[in-house]
A protein has these predicted regions:
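Hydrophobic beta-strand scaffold residues
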Residues: 1, 25-26, 53
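Structural motif
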Residues: 3-4, 29, 56, 84
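Rossmann-fold NAD(P)-binding glycine/threonine-rich loop
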Residues: 12, 29-53
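Short low-complexity, flexible loop/linker segments enriched in glycine and/or proline
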Residues: 18, 41-45, 50, 69-71, ...
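Adenosine-phosphate binding glycine-rich loop
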Residues: 49-89
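C-terminal catalytic/substrate-binding lobe primarily of soluble NAD(P)-dependent oxidoreductases
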Residues: 73-182
């Protein structure tokens, strides 16, 4: 099964459960932290069914995880992993090419409203979505960013238990203001 059906907070877990029950290998591009947390708990069931399950094979998560892993392998120690996107060049379209609501829109609204889960000070916890933080980027200075709910905050500490902090952010000059729902 190659699952690209979103939003994943609605469809991810039941499709994975059906794949395991059917004995089918499973790949997806899950980009929601809520099902990621539950999907990771199905590891032993997938192993018992002798199937391969790989979740989060998109750009983010996916490529972001690989980039984080490569960076971690180059360092002596890592206590914080922050993935994110630079939105400084984002401009709202004059007219949308979309004729209706799509999974990406629903995903974005879900992850920018309410609370989201991050890994902070060695434990998972809920924080307000779009909470402002400052990131000290070595050799570049301090950047302002906003927390955006995403699976990397769950998957990095799951696979690398020595990490103390993991989160996903959106940053960029004024671009984040486009996405703040007031």
């Amino acid at each position: 099964v190659l699952n690209t059906v979103g939003p994943f907070f609605k469809f991810g877990l039941p499709i994975l459960e059906a794949s395991i029950e059917s004995g089918c290998h499973y790949l997806d591009i899950c980009d929601d932290w809520e099902p990621t947390e539950e999907m990771l708990k199905l590891d032993s069931q997938a192993k018992d069914a002798e199937i391969t399950v790989i979740i989060g094979l998109g750009a983010s998560p996916g490529i972001t995880n690989l980039m984080g892993l490569i960076a971690m392998e180059e360092l002596d120690s890592v206590d914080t992993v922050i993935t994110g996107w630079d939105l400084s060049s984002v401009n709202p379209a004059e007219e949308s090419s979309q004729t209706g609501t799509n999974a990406a829109m629903i995903h974005g609204i879900q992850q920018m409203t309410g609370k989201v889960k991050i890994f902070e000070d060695g434990r998972l916890g809920m924080v307000q979505s779009l909470k402002g933080i400052k990131i000290n980027y070595p050799g570049k200075g301090i950047y302002k960013a906003n927390i955006f709910g995403h699976p990397e905050a769950i998957s990095f500490p799951h696979h690398f238990p020595k990490i103390k902090n993991a989160m996903n952010v959106a940053h960029g000059s004024k671009a984040i203001d486009i996405y703040i729902i007031k």
